[in-house]
Structure formats: structure tokens, C-alpha cells
Amino acid sequence: MLSRLAAHLVPFFGRLTVTADPGARIEPGTIIVANHTSLADPALVLAALRRRLGAEPVLLAAAGLWRVPGLGRALSRDGYVPVHRGTAHASAALDRAAVALASGRPVLLYAEGRIPPRSEASEAPPEEFRTGLARLAGATGATVVPVGQAGARRITSGGTVKQIAGVLTAPLRRPCLHVHIGAPLRLPEDVPAATALAHGAVTEAWRTAATALGESAAGTPVAAPPGPGRAGGVRRVRGRGRRRAGA
């Protein structure tokens, strides 16, 4: 339901365009990983995935959203997974995500684990990834689809007052927004290498999206994350078969 709602509401707040790599697809049990820049970007990504590929993924989101009246019930109804960051329950989100993947549902997560603490609305490359994505992919054998979004901070960013003002004025401004969907890939079993490679793939997808909006940050060199087997270790998925867990 929330994916459909996002698809209807996002055009009211901005002008969304979507591109995809050749062969981009969301198969059952796929992990989708996107860059996180704003409270608005989950709606952009959900709308883009539904528009371009007809996908309605389970979203891993901050547990605090479940305390918002009415929203928590809607999130639970769609099977979304609360993430209790910084607590002993944080790892439980990956267990629930694995169950969703096993049932054939795609799962959308944000490997940065937070919105960057910046006040300006301009774009910046994705921050360092946490290891949850690599561990989930390794445990389930799921393919990973990198997604880059740009423009969400034009809707809302910065402190509370600025965020509210951005949302209220967005329907008048209707900023340009762009989402780019990458081709599915397999991550190596080594967690640091897998994390670095996934970060690189999302960064490239983000760069494509930011370039589409004419963002100057798209041309900024990004330091290579540590870890062996950098870009050459990404295995793009050519067939439709899935790797079994532990393979």
C-alpha cells in the first residue's frame, strides 16, 4: 500500500524521473540498497521502483517511525521491519529481513544507517556503509540491486524548521528528483570486500542520478573504500538463477 501511496504522492512534491541500467530487474528475494540523504528519499525510491519495475519491497526503517500515530500500523501492515539502532535488538531486523527474502519479497535497506548530519540541500556521495547488508546477502544468497537517488534533500533537509518549510513549499517549487536503478550483482563472501563493493555500486548509481540533476558533487572523486577485490570483484548477474545461501 505504501509503495502505491508514494507513487501517487511524490509527483505532487516534485518532478521525478527514473533511469535504469540495461538488465536492471527486481527478482523475488532481492536485496535493494539505496543511498540515504533525507526523510523524503524512501518515498522517492519506493515510487521509482514501482513505476519502473513494478516492485513493492519490504522496507527496513528506523523504529521511531512506528511511534507515529497511524503510520506504525500502516508500516506493520505492509510487512516493514523496524530497526532499533544502537540497541541489542538491532540485529533482529536482519533476521526478519531474511524471513521476508525467503518468502520471495524484495527488501529495501539503507546501508549507511543514518541520514548525514548536513544542513545544506546539495548532494554528496554516500557515507561509509555498515556491514549489515553484506551479512544479510551472505546469509541468504540474495542478489543485490544498487539504487542511487538525488534531489530528496531539495524537498526536506537540515533542522526541524527547515524540514517542515521544505515539505510545505515543495508542491509550489516542485524540485527535480531522479532515481537510478543499477543492474543486479552478487557480492563476495568476504564481508569487508562485499561492503566496499556494494558502496561503490551505490555510489555509481547515485552519481548517475546526481548528474541527471546537474549536481556539481557528481563530479567529485570518491575515495575507494578499504577492502580487497574492489570494482573487479563485483559479479553482475546475467542469468535468472539465485545462489543458495552459503554457496
Show where each model-derived region lies:
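A cross-family acyltransferase "interaction/gating" segment
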Residues: 121-190
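Residue-level preference for the first positions of well-ordered beta-strands
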Residues: 29-31, 104-110, 145
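A conditional alpha-helix N-cap/helix-loop micro-motif detector
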Residues: 87-91, 126-127
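Acidic, Ser/Thr-rich low-complexity intrinsically disordered segments
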Residues: 223-247
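Hydrophobic/aromatic ligand-binding patch that stacks against planar heteroaromatic rings
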Residues: 74, 99, 135-137
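Catalytic core of membrane glycerolipid acyltransferases/transacylases, capturing the structured
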Residues: 27-86
